[in-house]
Swiss-Prot record:
Entries under PROSITE patterns matching the protein: RIBOSOMAL_S8
Domain of life: Bacteria
Assembly mode: Part of the 30S ribosomal subunit. Contacts proteins S5 and S12.
NCBIfam families (UniProt xref): PRK00136.1
InterPro entries recorded: Ribosomal_uS8, Ribosomal_uS8_CS, Ribosomal_uS8_sf
One of the record's GO molecular function terms: structural constituent of ribosome
Record's keyword annotation contains Transcription regulation: no
Purpose of the protein: One of the primary rRNA binding proteins, it binds directly to 16S rRNA central domain where it helps coordinate assembly of the platform of the 30S subunit.
Taxonomic lineage from the root: Bacteria, Pseudomonadati, Pseudomonadota, Betaproteobacteria, Burkholderiales
Record protein name field: Small ribosomal subunit protein uS8
BP terms from Gene Ontology: translation
An example Gene Ontology CC term for this record: ribosome
Keywords, in A-Z order: Ribonucleoprotein, Ribosomal protein, RNA-binding, rRNA-binding
């Protein structure tokens, strides 16, 4: 059976793994999921990630990050979904928690944070909020 929203599945796996204090979480890999994991690593929300498995069925393994026994990611939620895509122009990209969190945006120049998209002057699809 095919998955209707692989990005929501990725975010849910991360959220569920952190609730039970797992150190790593594994999921099927794709280019978009790897790009999201790269943004999460660059922003300091995860310790790292690696792509394992065969070329036919690659697996993305994310190493979660904790601080003083609590997950670094307090909130991670999907914004744009298959039934209702959310696109924002370069001037209307939202801030998450007045800049304390990040919005991950898929643009014509790749997947990036809201701050980087504003700096580059590009808009795109708002994939998720992370705080």
């Amino acid at each position: 059976m095919s998955m209707s929203d692989p990005i929501a599945d990725m975010l849910t796996r991360i959220r569920n793994a952190q609730q039970v204090d797992k150190t790593t979480v594994t999921m099927p890999a794709s280019k978009l999921k790897v790009a999201i994991a790269t943004v999460l690593k660059d922003e300091g929300y995860i310790d790292g990630y690696s792509v394992k498995g065969t070329q036919a069925k690659p697996e993305l393994e994310i190493t979660l990050k904790y601080y003083a026994g609590r997950p670094v990611i307090e909130r991670i939620e999907r914004v744009s979904r298959p039934g209702l895509r959310i696109y924002k122009g370069r001037t209307s990209i939202p801030q998450v928690m007045n800049g304390l969190g990040v919005a991950i945006v898929s643009t014509s120049r790749g997947v990036m944070t809201d701050r980087k998209a504003r700096a580059n002057g590009v808009g795109g699809e708002v994939l998720c909020y992370v705080a």
